[in-house]
Amino acid sequence: MVEGQRLVDVFRPTHYNIYLDINRETKVIAGKTTIKGFATQTAITLNQKFLSINNVTVNGQTVVATTNDTDETLTFAVPEPGEMTIVVDYTAPLTDTMMGIYPSYYQIDGQKKQLIGTQFETTAARQAFPSIDEPAAKATFSLAIKYDEHENETIIANMPEERVVDGVHYFAKTVKMSTYLVAFAFGEMQSKLTETSSGVKIGVFSTKAHQPAELDFALDIAKRSIEFYEDYYQTPYPLPHSWQLALPDFSAGAMENWGLVTYREAYLAIDADNASVEMKQRVATVIAHELAHQWFGDLVTMQWWDDLWLNESFANMMEYVAIDALQPDWHIWELFQTSEAASALQRDATDGVQSVHVQVEKPAEIDAIFDAAIVYAKGSRMLVMVRSLIGDDALRRGLKDYFETHKFANAKGADLWAALGKAAGIDLTAMMATWLEQPGYPVVNVSVVDGKLTLAQEQFFIGEGIDQDRQWQIPLNSNYAALPELMVTKTLELGDYEELRQNVGTPFRLNVDNTAHFIVNYEPALLQDILNHVDSLSAITQLQLLQDLRLLAEGRQISYAVVVPLLKSFATSRSSVVNTALYQVVGNLKKFVASDSPEEKALQQLVDTLSATQFDRLGWHKKANETIDDQVSRPVIADAALFAENKNAVASAHDLVQQNQQALVQLPADIRAIVLANEVKHYGSQALFDQLLTDYRTTSDGGYQRDIMAALTKTSDKALLEQIVSYFEDSETIKPQDLRGWYKGVLANDAGQQLAWDWIRDDWAWLEKTVGGDMEFTTYITVTARIFKTAERLTEFKAFFEPKLDTPGLTREITMDINVIASRVALVEEEKLAVQQAVKASL
């Protein structure tokens, strides 16, 4: 086959009949797949992985077929090109990797049960049935599934069940779609159903380990999201139902299978009466994200994985557009600023980072491009920039045209820009190429040169970076009308600054509302002019100042010592975005001090000065009629107060635990994690450890499980940390889907870092076998690099990971993360004394 040629270019399927007989006891699947399609050549190659092929026929004639497990293929010859029917008889395993067809495990009253589900994105449909497992190979699918069925069990799939004959469940034929979107599940389930105004059936399904009321919140959000998107896209939802299913074991956060969306339990089933605002926002945005995909990704699918951003970036933006419309009181775009924008700007500043549009071929490479900070966060930031530039009306007109033109088919990035550009009457292609095809982003340096206001763009790096003279078309979004809409040159000289300043009457600013993906480095006098008016600035502008100063300090373009004395100017804000941004900066200062050192005590004093008044105002409990800002700020402020060892905060947190000793799950959900962490840190014991670990093993509340994980990993007791690490490979205690959080927690704990670091090096082969097949695998390397800050750890990191540089899917991550750690080591060495002195001077 010619390099770069896809399998679909040789054989294009039109319809699959998939019969599966699944035995949970033996963990064996007997399958028979019939594929109708058209071949352009006589040598046919299908995808398969882990399949044992019994027989292959073409138009009723048996052919000799060869499997290649390295290439994940099944190859055979046919007499002549043209229309044909291929039938493959095979067996396949039920996997334990959360990929393909696999069991999820859970308990009810101590009895272990399982729920069978699927996860086929990116390239795991081939583990369930032979196929052209490429996004452009769209076809229709008819599922027929038999299983060792027990009483009270339910089976669901992309489409409604039509009939059951001799124990075989037959489902209606799907619309034309990609293989990775096929899905089904069976086992004991409960559900709640409703219907949209246009007649689409909406359902939420879970195991019976959950209380029925835990499905209500998701049902409401799902129903209203489908209704919102049908209106916003001006394109009807094309399937008869939209099922949402919580799986007990699930590697990703959620998956947009058309008509049967799957989720981690924590992202679907929640007790809305005792869930924090943050948890409700997370669940709502995840649901809205997956349902945005039903159009962006499912109805119109990227031609190949290099345009993954067409799916993920758009869904990431649309989750905020939808939830802002459905829950306007949440001010959800503020969450976008503190989470998506922050993560994108941090990750995208590392040399070697992927561009949003990136070339990939091998399955491991495809999985590795699911970089949340780039394809999701940066990509959505690009689209927010476009939306701001062309307006919502043009965006909606363009999307309607895009869906109409490419429905039930595939598209490339150029197709989207053509549709949006036509609707807006402007050429977006050239501008967006500078953002999507290039990695990184610019810093715009603003200065006054010979009296003239002058702008200059250059690529911004945190750590070492090779300047390749990249240039971006930057939407400047200035508050000074004299500036052009776009900066399309490396430098821009404007008019007399004093005259401009006098005419406008306010300090000069760029990127108003922080909608574009760049940061600004104002010369000291211009920055001071802005800071002199900080109280009159919007919350987003204050966040932006803190965000840009933090990044500039990380990139060593300014000193953190300059930033420290500015923090008090933001400490009394009642905006959650300002508080979040402020304590992100504070969090970054912690790397400059050693645990239990006089320097840490000084930093704690500073943080107490910043947070004490706010903590006294907010306390631990929600007040009547308090704002969303206060609800979101409370855990941020309380966490700061506990870091500061504020006596009132430490003691009152302990009192809360004592009052809820018999049912710690009943602690207020928004502050439960930090209250439990305080208890473990200051009042920890084997008894408390055992109580929390028992709760972790038995609760069906994913939020409570995360809180316990966050708390237990804070212990300074090495024996307890050794116990935690001993459970890393015990799936009865720590599910593989949750392991990364436990690993990260122990690694970030000075008392446990060596234990966790030794574990991952000693048991890397086990980790690779257990989670190496999914897109989360490389993030174990990422989280390690985020924590290490010493030259010794850098040396050890390189010694372990550099021999793995040639491993498919790991090359970029290892290279980047060596740079990340090296940058942090250099920054700490260079800035440590100055930062420590600045902290003392601020007391």
Name each model feature, range by range.
Residues 53, 115, 171, 204-466, ...:
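Hydrophobic alpha-helical and helix-loop surface patches within well-folded domains
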Residues 103-105, 156-163, 185-190, 276-279, ...:
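Short intrinsically disordered coil segments
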Residues 139, 150, 165-166, 238-239, ...:
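Short, well-ordered loop/turn elements at secondary-structure boundaries
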Residues 57-60, 111, 194-199, 261-262, ...:
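Short alpha-helical hairpin
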Residues 1-240, 266, 371-377, 387-393, ...:
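Acidic/His-enriched low-complexity segments
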Residues 99-100, 156, 181-185, 215-217, ...:
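Short conserved micro-motifs at the rims of enzyme active sites and ligand-binding pockets
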Residues 25-27, 135, 252-254, 700-701:
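Short glycine/serine/proline-enriched coil/turn segments at secondary-structure junctions
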Residues 144, 202, 292, 359-363, ...:
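Non-catalytic accessory/interaction domains
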